[in-house]
Amino acid sequence: MMPISIVKALIQGQPPARRLFVPLIFTLAAKLEDVPLSNFVVNPTKIANSLAAIHQRLRLDGVTCYFDLFLVAETLGCQLNLSTSPPALERPTRETALKMLQQRGDVKQRGRLPVALEVVHRLRGTLRNSPALVIGLPGPLRIAQQLFGQDVLRELAAGDDDALDSFETLVEITLSVAQAFCLAGAHLLYFDELDVPVEFLPEWQETMVAVWKTVRFHGALPVLSIPRALQIETNSSTDAMHLPEELKGRFEDPANAPLLCLKPASGEQAPLSGMPFALALPVTGETFPDVSPWLRAKECALVTTDGEIPYQLEIQKLQQQVAAMRSLFEGT
């Protein structure tokens, strides 16, 4: 079954015919073109050509058209130094950040967003209906931290009105950007979010429903990666998957939910919930933990990576790294 058909089945709440294998590979492709990263990320031709070449070599279920957790902040006006590894964002003053949100204009036409959208257009034509087209974006809480610093998390947890207004604006921006990628032809949107403060969790989830529903409405699958706050726990006596109390009833409706990206500890027993999930493999280290119980679970619909495979990896080792990941679930 083709990857795009599997994504559509997941959107419709149907069990997938097989799991998808989509490690996130983007900036590493710059090494195929042998160009500086700062040149690569603004050149849709080089991006599309190198990603197509990687797909022809690795035959993955998805191609990561763009992955940049600073993309939205830069679009809003933040300065990004791409010559460092990893790239460094210069955080604006609070007053400047507020002005950025107030005078944002049409963010889809600013920064590198037009480049990223063009890559999706090109790969959709070049690769036809073979792999799923993937976009990696920051969650709105991550963008808030980039703009306002760590204090914004405490302010949101305390219910500060200014912080809440800024967060709602960032959710609107996230929704607009996500919709643009869906309309361009992306099939899977990977949202990399921060830990959500417990006190802010209900508000965060309620606000994010609009993003999940919009992405699904446009025929794409939202995938949510969060370090710990939404970690699903396993009850060893019942083998049941339990959400935190604050989220019960909120992620049970697939139409209002993302595909949760889980990062289990080695050897931990997989949840049996009837609810599909994605499994994130670590992107660093020579060996992988034993995640066979999770891979045997029929609910494991997607195997991906915990973020982007780093640019620092030697391009010659990419095929070896992907083969090691693939070997984990062959035969499961």
Label every model-predicted segment.
Residues 81-180:
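Active-site-proximal, glycine-rich beta->alpha crossover segments in alpha/beta enzymes
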Residues 1-28, 36, 117-129, 162-165:
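N-terminal amphipathic alpha-helix/helix-capping segment at the start of soluble metabolic enzymes
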Residues 46-68, 176-188, 238-242, 249:
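Catalytic domains of carbohydrate-active enzymes, especially glycoside hydrolases
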Residues 89, 108-131, 200-224, 328:
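Alpha-helix-loop-beta-strand connector modules within alpha/beta enzyme cores
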Residues 33-46, 152-176, 278-286:
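Active-site mouth loops of central-metabolism enzymes
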Residues 70-80, 134-156, 184-207:
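Active-site-proximal loop/short-helix segments
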Residues 17-118:
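Alpha/beta catalytic barrel-like cores
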Residues 6-12, 32, 216-332:
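Catalytic-face loop-and-helix region of soluble metabolic enzyme cores
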